[in-house]
């Protein structure tokens, strides 16, 4: 099965930042859209719950929400926007500013690609 553009973008993110061990892209309801690599069972549901809770508690005026949480096994990073959320897992030594920068870069690329595709599909042949 061919990889989707979202899966390819997440694979690129893993190449861009060697600190990221896993990346998930979720829709606005918190359902899994794409992952790289395939997440362990149950992790996508937990990420979706985190995304929904972050939106309910912290979203203000459509601004993206950024959360990072450190635990013994590593760090969880979340960016939630009105359209999508991205969750990444890293080792504890990762620098949050760099991880968020790379995550935002890939989310921006995905948004541009979606806009270009919408224009392409919406264009009528002359």
Go through each PLM region and give its residues.
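Acidic, low-complexity cytosolic segments
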Residues: 1-22, 28-126
């Amino acid at each position: 099965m061919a990889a989707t553009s979202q899966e390819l973008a997440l694979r690129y993110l893993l190449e861009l930042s060697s600190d990221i061990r896993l990346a998930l892209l979720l829709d606005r309801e918190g359902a899994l859209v794409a992952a790289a690599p395939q997440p362990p069972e149950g992790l996508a549901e937990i990420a979706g719950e985190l995304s929904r809770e972050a939106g309910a508690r912290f979203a203000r005026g459509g601004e993206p929400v950024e959360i990072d949480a450190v635990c013994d096994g590593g760090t969880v990073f979340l960016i939630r926007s009105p359209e999508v959320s991205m969750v990444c897992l890293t080792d504890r030594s990762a620098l949050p500013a760099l991880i968020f920068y790379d995550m935002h870069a890939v989310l921006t690329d995905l948004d541009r690609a979606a806009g270009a595709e919408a224009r392409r599909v919406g264009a009528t042949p002359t």
